Amino acid sequence: MDADYGIPRELSDLQKLRSHYHPELPPCLQGTTVRVELRDATTAADPSGEHTIKRFFPHTYGQPLAHFLRATAKVPDAQIITEHPAIRVGVLFCGRQSPGGHNVIWGLHDALKVHNPKNILLGFLGGSEGLFAQKTLEITDDVLATYKNQGGYDMLGRTKDQIRTTEQVNAAMAACKALKLDGLVIIGGVTSNTDAAHLAEKFAETKCLTKVVGVPVTLNGDLKNQFVEANVGFDTICKVNSQLISNVCTDALSAEKYYYFIRLMGRKASHVALECTLQSHPNMVILGEEVAASKLTIFDITQQICDAVQARAEHDKNHGVILLPEGLIESIPEVYALLQEIHGLLRQGVSADKISSQLSPWASALFEFLPHFIRKQLLLHPESDDSAQLSQIETEKLIAHLVETEMNKRLKEGTYKGKKFNAICHFFGYQARGSLPSKFDCDYAYVLGHVCYHILAAGLNGYMATITNLKNPANKWHCGASPISAMMTVKRYGRGPGKASIGVPALHPATVDLRGKSYELLSQNATKFLLDDVYRNPGPLQFDGPGADAKAVSLCVEDQDYIGRIKKLQEYLDKVRTIVKPGCSQDVLKAALSAMASVTDILSVISSPSSVSTPF
Amino acid sequence: MDADYGIPRELSDLQKLRSHYHPELPPCLQGTTVRVELRDATTAADPSGEHTIKRFFPHTYGQPLAHFLRATAKVPDAQIITEHPAIRVGVLFCGRQSPGGHNVIWGLHDALKVHNPKNILLGFLGGSEGLFAQKTLEITDDVLATYKNQGGYDMLGRTKDQIRTTEQVNAAMAACKALKLDGLVIIGGVTSNTDAAHLAEKFAETKCLTKVVGVPVTLNGDLKNQFVEANVGFDTICKVNSQLISNVCTDALSAEKYYYFIRLMGRKASHVALECTLQSHPNMVILGEEVAASKLTIFDITQQICDAVQARAEHDKNHGVILLPEGLIESIPEVYALLQEIHGLLRQGVSADKISSQLSPWASALFEFLPHFIRKQLLLHPESDDSAQLSQIETEKLIAHLVETEMNKRLKEGTYKGKKFNAICHFFGYQARGSLPSKFDCDYAYVLGHVCYHILAAGLNGYMATITNLKNPANKWHCGASPISAMMTVKRYGRGPGKASIGVPALHPATVDLRGKSYELLSQNATKFLLDDVYRNPGPLQFDGPGADAKAVSLCVEDQDYIGRIKKLQEYLDKVRTIVKPGCSQDVLKAALSAMASVTDILSVISSPSSVSTPF
């Protein structure tokens, strides 16, 4: 099997064309001299967790933000790294394949070779298991040739994606030491980057010389916080899904007799569903976050869809397209509670066929109410992160089934007078995950790869490579690095089998912000989407011409560039210092004192633990 | 509802770009003067059915092939049509939406307006039901503006797609008379074109002045015969499906733990599955035609897949991608027989829950053996063409289930030593059907629209618009028209509820020719596909650059241009006549006589009814 990794392969004409595409580097990373500015120490967004995070990360918490600037940038404190001794770096895919992953490795390889041709990049074969077993492939131009700008993770493969147990951490450390690695780059999502931070702390504690760097690559788009604007893979996934969704919309409008229920891969959070809605304008989407916030039951959801179907029928429309995120099922309070009971029993070793009889009365009642196929799926063992096997639970079929039953009832009672309700169900995910990456994902991943090199060259440990201001063209991107521990939060409540992770700092999947601009855009258009069939067909992913440079709608509407604004604030503070120097007038000093007192008062109040709710 | 048809709509950037694309016309159709050559009378490919076809089509059988040539073409007998009195033409979508359908209407509209600005084109709203109810929308440049080169049938919509019963035929005739139509263009597949031929005959018989023209538009690609090389929509469908299949292949190769079972829409025949296999090189495909020819049972198929899984595991490969056409289920002899029994009972009014007890003993045994979900799907009422509801029967889940059971058994017995078998199932169809059409489909459909006009201008009735030599660039395409009745065959055997159609000439779906070049290409590569993972990713549908002008593999490898070769033969015959004129030498005459006697002997033998098996 391993012999197949990284082998050259036959490419289609389009793949060949793409393999010749070369992403642009932002000015700050061009050439071989990069200035590194390390400014203020970072803090966790949720102050209430800070104490715990500090305790878990004594060596790596509170490190400063890093900015990478062009050599000519006029920043007094920045350090120019001019010496580039040869280093050895390892890299691995950790977590589900996301389009663009290969380009991180390509970018890292290019940066390594530009700065010192003697630098060595080793790819671990088969993900974390390859790391533990020290199975490597040296990354060279030849190896990369047929993987540049290509989808999948097949250059190196991936496996179970966990570096968490003592045994796993020790195996990882042994590998880094045996291979004399100066750096270890972990490409993955929320879970893998959490593991990366813990690994970095362990390395710092034990004086292991390998620096650990994380890269935000996940199609779910849920590794989002004040430092991270977007994840590699999300753009492609949403574009491919939107292509398919809008094809289905066109189909619905042509035949006028089907309701399509489409479930979208994306784990617990509904980012993919929201973005696809903004791109393709289906009639409805039900976000897990809405359901959780309004505590909607499965019956509420059914009624809401039935009312929509009925409203459309009154406009003579007997077709429609409804999106459901795969995480929806866990967002429905009573289903979540049922799942927790089931998982608890599974953990106790109760066999699947015995579970029904051991559920609490109310859980048992819900369970027995559900159709046969969905019961079987709810009984599946939970995933390694303690969530249900979301990709295997056909929520779309469950909802379609309940809606159909209700519509037939309404038809019989005469309250619904439209055509007989017909549903067709889909699950979109696997068919998008292996796609050729979009231009944005190619560019973003490639530049992130370069950033990884500069993090290592600066000797930083436990950082994630970050690029901000992404909605602007690549030549305006800001490159930097943030300590992963500063992105962590601590969950204090929980129940069920996941209890073990309570109290341990971790990156948690960012949910859709119901007060954010993307959601606002959806809310404003929801009625129009529902009734007017303003379906939008962005078409298949293009690499040239209109649409090729389009970016995710949610990326473009959100307030962005947190890090740019942090820098702006620092400039203001510097300016105040320059203006209010000893010798300035009484009036100027008075005005400055008054204004600063007011600012500090306001900030103290709104950043006290009691008033903060984590924005992600 | 109707108010929504043909309304201008917001297009995405890519849709806008596409809406400005203008297909090229072959030289023969350029300008306003086209020469029509009507040569030899056509005959049915299967002589044994000829008598019956003649009886059903006394007015429209045996009409000559028509060729459209450029005005300057030196063909002695061709007629130049110079007068173009204003005509009124109706057009409707009939049958499942196929990408490119809109362009037939656009091409027809352009041709009408070029030849006489007073020509009128009426689109029927909502397919055949719009025809019966005489609901029309006049097609204008404004209406077309946002539908050019766009997918779906939403400009006019479509419905049940049948013009067959006396009542339906009479309603159609009434509409044509009331609207004073000179021509009626029916856009559809096998069934709709059969209806078109019968309608043409009826019109001829009753002296209705409306001429009926059919256009081969069906994503299934099964309207294929000596006159028709390809169908509008097939190219797009196969490209979109291949994009998704190859994404799944990349995914399989990255995660290395799943077997993907993908069922493909395409009705009874396996053209879509074959073409997608040739484009994306998955590990396996099981064509319905192979199963039928080898009389494989469902157990044989299971064993065959299990052996493949086992062979791959011996090469350390625990992943794979397997394609199944949706028609497969009907190709399995014992399942087909079971379906016939079920449909018979359903027709007798037996309710679904009672059917199991009334099946014959062997059918009952098979039925009870099948998993619960598939039993429910087999009990669905058959479609209007008497076939099972193929899109609703999850054959891929059935096969995956049976394979999993068998692999677990082998694992237990120790005959299989690979990893635990994991299957993920997909059905690809709806998400491809509404796609933006490929350049080929845009061009092909647009030119077919023009051909329709010339058929009507030449006063032909009961013809299908045909273009041959399609594998070459559009400027080498040959445009013509063939009587639909000449493409018909007569089924003499059959059982079950479909019996009524036995003995009536019809177009039957062309199955994959197991002696054809496309299948040969598959056979040659099958082992390599199975074991070597030579996955090919053509990428998303492009409209520019590499791949944009690619044509279906099966189109390119098949011997083509039947009509071009018919013309070539006529040239040979003409040449013989020129050479062997009275006055030629004894030797020349002797040689000619001997050669011609031999040729006629050979042709008589191989075209006798007993030796002909229909090639489609």
From Swiss-Prot, chains A, B:
Q: State the GO CC annotations.
A: cytoplasm
Q: What is one process in the GO biological process aspect for this record?
A: response to glucose
- Molecular functions per Gene Ontology: 6-phosphofructokinase activity; ATP binding; diphosphate-fructose-6-phosphate 1-phosphotransferase activity; metal ion binding
Query: Tell me, what controls this protein's activity?
Result: Allosterically activated by fructose 2,6-bisphosphate.
Q: Gene3D superfamilies, per this entry?
A: 3.40.50.450, Phosphofructokinase domain, Phosphofructokinase, domain 3
- Pathway(s) per entry: Carbohydrate degradation; glycolysis; D-glyceraldehyde 3-phosphate and glycerone phosphate from D-glucose: step 3/4
Question: Keywords on this record?
Answer: Allosteric enzyme, Cytoplasm, Glycolysis, Kinase, Magnesium, Metal-binding, Transferase
Protein localization: Cytoplasm
Q: Which InterPro entries match?
A: PfpB_PPi_PFK, Phosphofructokinase_dom, PKF_sf
Job of this protein: Regulatory subunit of pyrophosphate--fructose 6-phosphate 1-phosphotransferase.
Describe, as the record does, how this protein assembles with itself and its partners: Tetramer of two alpha (regulatory) and two beta (catalytic) chains.
**Family recorded in the similarity comment:** Belongs to the phosphofructokinase type A (PFKA) family. PPi-dependent PFK group II subfamily. Clade 'Long' sub-subfamily.
Please identify the protein, giving its name as recorded.
Answer: Pyrophosphate--fructose 6-phosphate 1-phosphotransferase subunit alpha
Q: Which organism is it from?
A: Solanum tuberosum
